Amino acid sequence: MLIELDYHGHHIEVYAAGLQGAWDAVVRIRRSPSGDQVHFDRVPFGEPTADLAEQQALIWAKRWVEDTERSK
């Protein structure tokens, strides 16, 4: 599990989920500190290891936060 406590005011949690020999990741993003906005997603990567899936998912989550901020 990877946790980013404060990325542009968001709390990000990422953990790997294995499926048929490949690893995807589950991402939970919530706005800090209120936590009133929560985004939950399973991101299909098909990575060979859990670590790689988590690292890729953290990058994906940070881009999601940045894109969400830009669209405001």
Report the location of each language-model feature.
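N-terminal segment of the canonical double-stranded RNA-binding domain
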Residues: 1-33
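Intrinsically disordered, low-complexity regions
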Residues: 2-6, 38, 60, 64-72
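Residue-identity detector for glutamine
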Residues: 20, 37, 55-56
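A short, exposed loop/beta-hairpin motif centered on an aromatic-Gly-Thr core
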Residues: 37-52
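A short, charged, amphipathic alpha-helix used as a generic interaction element across diverse proteins
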Residues: 48-66
